[in-house]
Amino acid sequence: MVAATEFPVSPMLTDAARRNRLWVRIWLYCVIVTLFAIVLVGGATRLTDSGLSITEWKPIHGVIPPLGEAEWAEEFARYQQIPEYEQINKGMSLEEFKGIFWWEWAHRLLARGVGFVFALPLLFFWVTGRLERHLKPKLLGILALGGLQGAVGWWMVASGLSERVDVSQYRLATHLTIACLIFNATMAVARGLAPHSGKPALDSTRRFAFWLVVAVLVQIYLGGLVAGLDAGMAYNTWPLMDGALVPQGLFEHRPAWVNLFENPKTVQFVHRLGAYVVLLLALWHAIATLRAEPDSTHARRAVLLFLLVCVQAAIGIATLLMVVPMDVALAHQAMALIVLGFATAHWRATRGAYPFMQAAA
């Protein structure tokens, strides 16, 4: 049997330290909820083809939407200059434009908002000495990822403003994955500050839980490629694709590797395979943990994680069979975040709470 990893031994938490951890944890959970909302609104923006409706990046002035008919006409005129309007939405009315504008505007507003939700409390906790030393580099790293995400978001939008009629699937998948990394990192820190009970997890359990998180992240990246290519429309049957387990034409482009990123049929096929892999890994993890650590909190979490993956798989199948309706597709995206968040919390819990380190004077 593999030896258990001992939870870090730390000095007894004082009442003040316990309160500080509680407030920092509450703040981070608020950040997580905001991130969840951003990703869902981003998904709706993609599903409604709204992502290119705002053709400029104005970090400050962009908070204020058009306020009068003249400003709306000016905003619409800018949109009419890009290929998406010329080739896809020619003849769109101003009212129809407003419909797609508000999705993109809401997504950008939430993205700006989460910066304040994260940065201002971080500054407060820092200057008041409520942050333990080991938390500071972790939180600064998350803040840096947030700044990078803003730049990647505009880089993604810019890909659809000159020649394409949509954004690059490479950039969209990157944008989604970075958002999930921020979500993942925030969840890990929050869970590390929570009290832990029970015996430490075995090394094998902890390692498997980590790689399961990685597998979920990879699957989300593949889902980003599916969204970017509208690959969910390629085959709307299950379990077969075009009447076969392995459909024809998966590698019709040259070089062959390009199909993994640019052929909608191949991208959907790989995403399906990824789903089966995650499902099998979650099942294996649940069975192995139940055998190695019966009646432990780790085993119960592993079983619950497997059940969440099953629900996500069912929603994914429904999304295909129903030809990607917006509500079901958004439920699929939301469930992906729930699976990722729970998998991350589960992995972090196998390592125990952070050791207590007093904030530097």
Curated annotation (Swiss-Prot):
EC nos: 1.17.99.9
Top enzyme class: oxidoreductase
Keyword terms, alphabetized: Cell membrane, Heme biosynthesis, Iron, Membrane, Metal-binding, Oxidoreductase, Transmembrane, Transmembrane helix
Catalyzed reactions: Fe(II)-heme o + 2 A + H2O = Fe(II)-heme a + 2 AH2
Pathway assigned to this chain's UniProt record: Porphyrin-containing compound metabolism; heme A biosynthesis; heme A from heme O: step 1/1
Parts of the chain that traverse the membrane: 22-42, 109-129, 139-159, 175-195, 208-228, 269-289, 303-323, 324-344
Main location: membrane
Cofactors that this protein relies on: heme b
GO MF entries: metal ion binding; oxidoreductase activity, acting on NAD(P)H, heme protein as acceptor
Subcellular location: Cell membrane
UniProt GO BP: heme A biosynthetic process
UniProt record similarity statement: Belongs to the COX15/CtaA family. Type 2 subfamily.
Record PANTHER family: CYTOCHROME C OXIDASE ASSEMBLY PROTEIN COX15 (PTHR23289), CYTOCHROME C OXIDASE ASSEMBLY PROTEIN COX15 HOMOLOG (PTHR23289:SF2)
Known partners and oligomeric status: Interacts with CtaB.
Listed name of the protein: Heme A synthase
